[in-house]
Amino acid sequence: MHAGGVCFGFQPRTSLSLRFLRPGVGERLEIAELEETEPPVGRPLREWRPPANPLHARLYRHEARFHLWVEDGGWYTIDPAQPEILVPKGVDPLQREERLWSIPALLCFVQRGDVPLHGAAVEIDGGAVLLCGPSRAGKTTLTAALLGDGHRVLTEDLSCLRPAPSPAVLPGPAMLRVRRDAYQRLKPPGAVVGRDHDRIHLMLDGELRGDGRPVPLRAVLLLRSSDHVQSERVPPQDALRDLWALSLKLPLEEDRSRCFHGLVQLTDAVPIWNLHRPLTYGHLPAVVAEVARLCSVP
């Protein structure tokens, strides 16, 4: 059965309840519960560890399938060619859905030819602006400030980019996980659906959820720390180097080649900017105004 909405251009077929979908239709994605799995044997294809990443996770590959282990979250089995994602049974449904729309979904939309980047995306006047940077670069706090200013959040941390025929962002899950101190200061709109030791988990509804249609990409902003709010255009060759470091790719030759060609298309077609700003709440209004301005620069 269809779950009644889309995420990253996929329309899930599942009996599970999914709360972060956006209205629309898309490509079929099978999602079901995984009864149990035998842990893969051998070295992981890739591993993520704190503090550079919020969770400890390992990704394995066996023939056409991937197996993702997440600490305190169980196993996910992903078959991108189908596409199909099997999620763990008996775990917290909120955490499970949040993790479903991370690496498992990424593996499926990469198979489709889309490009993943480590960045948030916000819609401003009908166009998307990508906010890129490593963990702890202030992406989520800036995204929360833009949300509070009335701009729709397309995705909070993992962006799905379609490079051709013209670059566009496919909206991800309608959610935002905000640090507790940022939530208290900014009070962004959204229904609180969960809390943990570090974050408030918000679900976006109404106009701030919007639909799942692709949004034309107008600008990519590389977030930098500075004493002043300022920006400058980045030459395509320099932007390619920075975006390569922020791209989410596997240590496989075909995946690296796919990623490189997608980023070349992106840097040739979309303005890339360095956005320098102080990481203070007092400067956020000026930063929000600068983001909106850069989204309108041809």
Where are these regions (language model features)?
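Glycine-rich, often acidic-flanked micro-motifs
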Residues: 1-24, 120, 124-134, 148-298
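A short linear-motif detector with a strong N-terminal bias
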Residues: 9-13, 45-48, 55-57, 63-65, ...
